[in-house]
């Protein structure tokens, strides 16, 4: 092979590589991939709208039924209208029981776990994986309902992110903005006094939306820590929002939380995600 042929071959190979795009990028329409997220294999259901060349990312978190595929499907309307690439990971129960999923892996058997092992850090790894596949630092938002909302509230309280918006829909419990209440239902017993104040302030400054179905009022909670926050999912959301707002005002801190309510809807991810209020909840 002469020099001219070698140069021509190299140029053509480079051209092909540049035009081929990311090998494992989510396809147009629905998809399913098994992803190694920092050593943890996870199934991720995806949706990419047609006619949307550079979508931002929406990571969706399922409830206790762990039906990530359904949650992916519930957000397709949002994705089409807002140009969103949807990724809905499955947190399998065997690997992610309640303490490690909805309560964030912060505390197990009353013992605070190593911060490097908190489950929310997997979200950062998953976002990094998507960015590598897309070959660009796309912006992202997080959306969770029920147990997925509980998980995202622990993430918002304990794990710094670059999320444009973190939407917590109809969560069964929250991290109450207090250092007097032990984690994972408050921020207590995790930090030193100085670090705790900084963590509390950062929590209130998060771009967090508490998104509530006004009909989610059934008193079906058997957890005393959650019941201390209110007698229903709806009331707990109202109470934690008001407590956060009042504390921020008292301390002179920025308060970036938003409260969005949906009349006539109870504990339904499908209805919450398909309502016009979902756009308000997700807006940066």
Where are these regions (language model features)?
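Bacterial N-terminal signal peptides that target proteins for export
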Residues: 1-11
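Bacterial N-terminal signal peptides
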Residues: 9-20
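A domain-start/cap signature at the N-terminus of enzymes
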Residues: 21-57, 69-70, 81, 109-111, ...
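Short substrate-entry loop that stabilizes the transition state in hydrolases
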Residues: 52-55, 60, 64-97, 176
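Cap/lid segment of the alpha/beta-hydrolase catalytic domain
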Residues: 92-117
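Conserved acidic catalytic loop of the alpha/beta-hydrolase fold
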Residues: 122-138
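The feature captures the conserved acid-bearing segment of alpha/beta-hydrolase catalytic domains
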Residues: 165-249
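C-terminal catalytic histidine-bearing segment of alpha/beta-hydrolase fold enzymes
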Residues: 211, 221-222, 241-284
């Amino acid at each position: 092979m002469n020099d001219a042929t070698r140069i021509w071959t190299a140029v053509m190979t480079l051209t092909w590589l540049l035009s081929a795009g990311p090998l494992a990028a989510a396809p147009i329409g629905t998809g399913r991939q098994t992803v190694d997220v920092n050593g943890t294999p996870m199934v991720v259901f995806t949706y990419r709208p047609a006619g949307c060349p550079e979508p931002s990312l929406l990571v969706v978190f399922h409830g206790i039924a762990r039906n990530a595929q359904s949650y992916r499907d519930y957000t397709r309307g949002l994705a089409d209208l807002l140009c969103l690439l949807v990724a809905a990971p499955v947190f399998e129960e065997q690997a992610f029981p309640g303490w490690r999923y909805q309560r964030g892996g912060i505390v197990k058997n009353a013992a605070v776990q190593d911060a490097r092992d908190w489950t929310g850090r997997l979200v950062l790894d998953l976002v990094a994986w998507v960015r590598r596949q897309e070959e660009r630092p796309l912006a992202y938002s997080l959306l969770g309902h029920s147990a997925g909302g509980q998980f995202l509230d622990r993430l918002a309280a304990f794990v710094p992110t670059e999320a444009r918006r973190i939407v917590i829909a109809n969560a069964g419990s929250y991290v109450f903005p207090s250092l007097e209440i032990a984690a994972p239902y408050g921020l207590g017993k995790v930090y030193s006094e100085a670090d705790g104040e900084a963590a509390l302030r950062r929590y209130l400054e998060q771009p967090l939306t508490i998104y509530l179905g006004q009909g989610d009022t059934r008193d079906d909670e058997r957890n005393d820590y959650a019941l201390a926050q209110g007698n229903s999912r709806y009331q707990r959301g109202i109470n934690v929002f008001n407590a956060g707002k009042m504390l921020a005002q008292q301390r002179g801190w920025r308060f970036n939380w938003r409260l969005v309510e949906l009349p006539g809807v109870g504990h339904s991810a499908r209805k919450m995600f398909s309502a016009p209020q979902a756009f308000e909840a997700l807006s940066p």
